[in-house]
Amino acid sequence: MSLNFLEFEKPIAELEAKIEALRDVSRHGGDSAIDLDKEIEQLEKKSLELKKKIFSDLGAWETAQLARHPLRPYTLDYVQHVFEEFDELAGDRAFADDKAIVGGIARLEGRPVMIIGHQKGRETKEKVRRNFGMPKPEGYRKALRLMEMAERFNMPIITFIDTAGAYPGVGAEERGQSEAIAKNLKVMSGLKVPVICNVVGEGGSGGALAIGVGDYVNMLQYSTYSVISPEGCASILWRDSDKAPQAAEAMGLTAPRLKELELIDEIIEEPLGGAHRDHVKMAENMKATLLRQLEDLEQLDEESLRERRYQRLMNYGYC
């Protein structure tokens, strides 16, 4: 599988191409393969050191590129690797089933939970079917329906956020995009069950926030969370989308910066090179975090849970 190396990863890509070429020779080169083992080992060490060096000092723009990586695990990947017995639930019971939002009931180590998340799609057909992970009002109303169901059956809610933003089309606006988002914010803030939100890729504006109000808000190490994309910000402030790297730095959209501002609770570590390099390892890190946080929240009664969430929301903007 091609890893789709990003621009800043070119030195790593060149090294790994050399390693793969040597492995190919080793596999088909007969007796000469013995002489290549040491060289392959040296190149692998060099590649590891280079990865550590590059990924220890990523800027906001490089992080934004990683957050959008096409091979990054999406909601259904986490469903596959973290949960058991997933049953997808569809439709908002009012207009349509928006494929940009997926949700359903599953088990986490035997514990029933409700899962809701954005789903982007990888191949062209799937991307179009999922509307590139940009939900319409019916998507957010589906999410709301599942949240209310979870509350009725006393199931914790776990959300996975990965969207460039809510879909800005005319039809979406006519069907009440802003109302759907606003209602989700209102309802989520008062739910009587634990809610854990995870930004796993792009956290784009209200489209992300509509499933992002919770008792814990986590971000993956190389995810982003912001009111607008770096390109959009650059176009507004400098009339030049090419200034996106400068905009990304100014926006403070990375997990460490948002943790510093106390807008998120925890940063979930990614495998070296990003979550796309090892879906299973990333899922293990996610699962460990969810289990620990759920255990913490399950110690609270309904009133304490809601009060804790209310205080958390009221403290936004104070550092």
Curated annotation (Swiss-Prot):
Major subcellular location class: cytoplasm
Pfam families: ACCA (PF03255)
Pathway terms, separated by semicolons: Lipid metabolism; malonyl-CoA biosynthesis; malonyl-CoA from acetyl-CoA: step 1/1
Superkingdom, taxonomy of origin: Bacteria
Catalyzed reactions per annotation: N(6)-carboxybiotinyl-L-lysyl-[protein] + acetyl-CoA = N(6)-biotinyl-L-lysyl-[protein] + malonyl-CoA
Assigned GO CC terms: acetyl-CoA carboxylase complex
Disulfide bonds: none
Its EC number(s): 2.1.3.15
Positions of the CoA carboxyltransferase C-terminal domain: 35-296
UniProt entry keywords in alphabetical sequence: ATP-binding, Cytoplasm, Fatty acid biosynthesis, Fatty acid metabolism, Lipid biosynthesis, Lipid metabolism, Nucleotide-binding, Transferase
Primary enzyme class: transferase
GO MF term list: acetyl-CoA carboxylase activity; ATP binding; carboxyl- or carbamoyltransferase activity
GO biological process: fatty acid biosynthetic process; malonyl-CoA biosynthetic process
Subcellular location: Cytoplasm
InterPro entries for the chain: Acetyl_CoA_COase_a_su, ClpP/crotonase-like_dom_sf, COA_CT_C
Annotated function: Component of the acetyl coenzyme A carboxylase (ACC) complex. First, biotin carboxylase catalyzes the carboxylation of biotin on its carrier protein (BCCP) and then the CO(2) group is transferred by the carboxyltransferase to acetyl-CoA to form malonyl-CoA.
Similarity comment: family membership: Belongs to the AccA family.
Subunit structure: Acetyl-CoA carboxylase is a heterohexamer composed of biotin carboxyl carrier protein (AccB), biotin carboxylase (AccC) and two subunits each of ACCase subunit alpha (AccA) and ACCase subunit beta (AccD).
Protein name as it appears in the record: Acetyl-coenzyme A carboxylase carboxyl transferase subunit alpha
Upper taxonomic lineage: Bacteria, Pseudomonadati, Pseudomonadota, Gammaproteobacteria, Vibrionales
